[in-house]
């Protein structure tokens, strides 16, 4: 499928969709470098009564095992110019250290939800 309901109304839904594409073997991601999106004062969510904002960053890390920032940095390389289809990330010391921090966050989140 496309966008997941668990990220509605859109917090971290784009990285989640990109992760689905990555897992299907898609390696061409253009237009994800530094860009700005204007939401015009949250007109979509502001009108809803009893609106509850989702915690997309937490949902993403529980679903995929690492943060959306980690995915964008090591997989999508969102700070780099597009040259060719992406390859698997370089799994160096920085990669494993950041992945370790993501795993610690998951453990912390599990601990908090059991209280």
What are these regions (language model features)?
Residues 38-39:
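Histidine-centered active-site/metal-ligand motif
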Residues 28-29, 43-115:
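C-terminal, non-catalytic tails of nucleotide-sugar-dependent glycosyltransferases
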Residues 1, 6-35:
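A short, conserved alpha-helix in the catalytic core of glycosyltransferases
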